[in-house]
């Protein structure tokens, strides 16, 4: 219902103005009275709007929460592997969930990217489009997702629901172990729908080129937003699998492309595939905007890889130049400052080179999409190969701290996320984490 401000102005101050005997019958008094009334009305209106945020947001127009007006985002990815490490009994789970939030706060984080859909499954008991995930503790005796969100809200921690959009199977979730009543299994044995799910190099994927796959993903996101109080939806880099120049690679969704050409499609196969991903992103973003939550994606950091014709097919230049696809993009900047390729040269994904590429892209596309960075806490204290005789991750303990400092110098990076929660607890990561915590206090 439309609010009537005139009827909401308190009467007592107006009565006082009207009874002011010193000014009532003089021109000066009349002017002062009018000015006082106008000043009061203005102050009241401003205080009313400030105290009624829901109405104030409606005045600004419908849409998602603004990233620009928020403080620096500091998030942690909580993956299906982290879910597997949680207690199986409800009370113990609830206690551990509270501890998770304490660990986030202690280390300067205020946002959780919580896995809710990793292998065409669902992590919430109130979700039905995809089957309940085997990775969730409790065997269905309670709702771990609901508890995690509840414990997060108690501590003022935002939760973004993390989806892997197309992946169906992996070494951790084999096809033969997927429930027979799963929508992907039903597709595979239903005439006319069997191409909704595709086998490629030993693993299964939802076909990005089929409307049924997009509709199922959208329905799953919608039911999550209907039933769980999350603040955002988050996709990572699992878009198209790598399709080589082999016949199998060409065939992945080539039949859909050929049908599209018969219907008037004029673009190349690469352009067609990019458009399929863009279509899904646009539909998800529209849903999120309608619900007032954020939507972002976290692709690989190498722009050359994203622009290739053999993998991902995320049209990064297109989505960065528009407000219609995502609210933020968070490249997975997991490599260090001295990363090298096999020839001993600076790698395209070396941190400063990659940071410069993303800053340039963000600026050249008019800053339509907020830029954030994913950081590789999981590498801290390890001898992970980075092209050097001895990995910088093994010899140094302030890499993430310096990465944040360099990103802040750009003036456009709006936040960070570290992968992953389990690494917050590892002894080898504590010095790196302590240094990161110190820069988060600034």
Where are these regions (language model features)?
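Substrate-binding cleft of secreted/luminal carbohydrate-active enzymes
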Residues: 325-344, 369-442
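Aromatic- and acidic-residue-enriched segments that line the glycan-binding/catalytic groove
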Residues: 125-136, 167-199, 238-262, 388-392
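Polysaccharide-binding and catalytic clefts of secreted carbohydrate-active enzymes
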Residues: 188-303, 307-325, 332-335
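Catalytic domains of carbohydrate-active enzymes, especially glycoside hydrolases
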Residues: 95-120, 228
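Aromatic- and glycine-enriched glycan-recognition loops and surfaces
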Residues: 89-106, 133-153, 216, 275-282
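Aromatic-lined carbohydrate-binding/catalytic grooves of carbohydrate-active enzymes
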Residues: 109-141
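Active-site-adjacent "subsite" loops/lids of carbohydrate-active enzymes
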Residues: 71-73, 77-91, 161, 166-223, ...
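The substrate-binding groove and active-site-proximal loops of carbohydrate-active enzymes
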Residues: 81-91, 129-141, 200-215, 266-276, ...
């Amino acid at each position: 219902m439309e609010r009537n401000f005139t009827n909401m102005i308190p009467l007592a101050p107006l009565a006082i103005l009207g009874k002011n005997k010193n000014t009532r019958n003089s021109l000066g008094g009349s002017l002062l009275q009018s000015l006082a009334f106008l000043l009061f009305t203005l102050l009241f209106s401003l205080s009313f709007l400030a105290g009624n945020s829901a109405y104030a947001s409606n005045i600004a127009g419908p849409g998602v929460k603004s990233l620009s007006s928020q403080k620096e985002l500091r998030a942690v990815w909580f993956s299906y592997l982290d879910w597997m490490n949680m207690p199986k009994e409800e009370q113990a789970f609830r206690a551990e969930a509270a501890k998770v939030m304490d660990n986030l706060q202690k280390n300067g984080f205020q946002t959780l990217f919580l896995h809710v859909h990793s292998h065409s499954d669902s992590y919430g008991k109130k979700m039905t489009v995809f089957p309940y995930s085997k990775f969730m503790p409790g065997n269905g005796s309670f709702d771990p997702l609901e508890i995690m969100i509840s414990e997060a809200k108690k501590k003022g921690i935002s939760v973004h629901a993390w989806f892997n959009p197309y992946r169906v199977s992996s070494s951790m979730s084999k096809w033969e172990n997927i429930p027979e009543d799963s929508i992907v299994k039903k597709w595979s044995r239903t005439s006319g729908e069997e191409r909704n799910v595709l086998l490629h190099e030993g693993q299964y994927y939802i076909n990005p080129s089929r409307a049924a796959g997009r509709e199922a993903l959208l329905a799953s996101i919608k039911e999550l937003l209907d039933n769980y109080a999350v603040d955002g939806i988050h996709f990572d880099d699992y878009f198209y699998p790598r399709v080589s120049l082999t016949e199998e690679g060409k065939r992945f969704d080539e039949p859909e492309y050929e049908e599209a050409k018969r219907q008037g499609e004029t673009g190349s196969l690469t352009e067609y595939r990019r458009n399929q991903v863009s279509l899904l992103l646009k539909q998800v973003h529209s849903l999120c905007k309608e619900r007032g939550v954020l939507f972002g994606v976290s692709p690989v950091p190498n722009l050359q890889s994203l622009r290739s014709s053999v993998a991902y097919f995320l049209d990064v230049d297109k989505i960065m130049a528009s407000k219609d696809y995502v609210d933020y993009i968070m490249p997975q900047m997991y490599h260090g400052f001295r990363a090298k390729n096999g020839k001993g040269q600076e790698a395209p994904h070396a941190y400063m080179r990659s940071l410069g590429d993303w800053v340039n892209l963000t600026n050249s596309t008019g800053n339509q999409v907020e830029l954030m960075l994913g950081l590789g806490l999981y590498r801290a204290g390890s001898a992970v190969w980075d092209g050097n005789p001895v990995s910088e991750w093994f010899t140094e303990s302030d890499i993430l701290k310096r990465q944040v400092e360099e990103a802040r110098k750009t003036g456009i990076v709006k936040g960070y996320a570290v992968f992953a929660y389990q690494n917050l607890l590892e002894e080898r990561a504590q010095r790196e984490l302590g240094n990161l915590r110190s820069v988060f206090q600034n």
